[in-house]
Swiss-Prot record:
This is Serine protease 3. Disulfide bonds join 69-85, 193-208, 218-246. PANTHER family: FI18310P1-RELATED, POLYSERASE-RELATED. SUPFAM superfamilies: Trypsin-like serine proteases. The keyword Protease applies. Residues 1-17 form the signal peptide. The gene is Jon99Ci. GO terms for cellular component: extracellular space. It comes from Drosophila melanogaster.
Length: 272
């Protein structure tokens, strides 16, 4: 089994400091370098206005320390994101209808009392959380993404083409203008992901994609959506990448949404 290292938010120099092969990290926890491509979906394409109406930028705060994640609108009052994004946060500001995250259509701020993490979340497993929001009306720039149906809960999505989206890096005390990017990726088998990261990390609760030509999710994309190209269903939540960097070719890992459809239904009443 491959080694596993889980890094803290304050960790720096991740690519040079690790010696364990095929370690991984939450994208939230990678070092941020201003001015480089590390802060966004790597080697993706700029999103057009209204192309990804279901994504929200999520700016989280803990005692004045800020970090950036993504999330997906699944209902008028619900956003789905990664549990590791909400860990330790006192509040979250949600940016709706934005291509440039400094220019959202509107914004809501909610306290941590509105966070519902999956009860068995630990480290890398069960990495999902709900955020209860004020009511949001849908239109061309702001809309929900549908979950897979309960009948589709056993679909592996292996070899399906999917799309990830995100803005990228959190910022260190400065307002860096970032534009929303998208990238098309292909789902690989759980066995392929386990061969790279080990079975403790890439469990049946994980869905992985290959990252050819440096195309991948990266820091700041945590919690963002992975959506099927055919049918537009939310099947993954950005969770982890190789700790050696986003462009080294290691699989990118997402929380497998179909494993949690019943829990989401119980908490929100949303199901298909």
């Amino acid at each position: 089994m491959r080694g596993l290292t889980l890094l803290s938010l304050a960790f720096l120099g991740v690519c040079s400091a690790l010696t364990v092969p095929h370690s991984l990290v939450h994208p939230r926890d990678l070092e941020i370098r201003h001015g480089g491509i590390e802060g966004r979906i790597t080697n993706g394409n700029l999103a057009s206005e209204g192309q990804v109406p279901y994504i929200v930028g999520v700016s989280l705060n803990s005692n004045g320390n800020w970090w950036w994640c993504g999330g997906s609108i699944i209902g008028h009052t619900w956003v789905l994101t990664a549990a590791h994004c909400t860990a330790g946060a006192d509040e979250a500001s949600l940016y709706y209808g934005a291509v440039n995250y400094n220019e959202p259509a509107f914004r809501h701020t909610v306290s941590s009392e509105n966070f519902i993490r999956y009860p068995h979340y630990v480290g890398l497993d069960h990495d999902l959380a709900l955020i209860k929001t004020p009511h949001v009306d849908f239109y061309s720039l702001v809309n929900k993404i549908e979950l897979p149906s309960l009948d589709d809960r056993y679909n592996s999505y292996e070899n399906n083409w999917v799309q990830a989206a995100g803005w990228g890096a959190i910022y260190d005390g400065s307002n860096v203008v970032e534009d929303l990017r998208v990238v098309d990726l292909k789902v690989i088998s759980v066995a392929e992901c386990q061969a790279y990261y080990g079975t403790d990390t890439a469990s049946e609760n994980t869905i992985c994609v290959e990252t050819p030509d440096g195309k991948a999710t990266c820091q700041g994309d945590s919690g963002g959506p992975l959506v099927t190209k055919e049918g537009d269903k939310l099947i993954g939540i950005t969770s982890f990448v190789s700790a050696y960097g986003c462009q080294v070719g290691g699989p990118a890992g997402f929380t497998r949404v179909t494993k949690y459809l019943e829990w989401i239904k119980e908490e929100t009443g949303i199901y298909y």
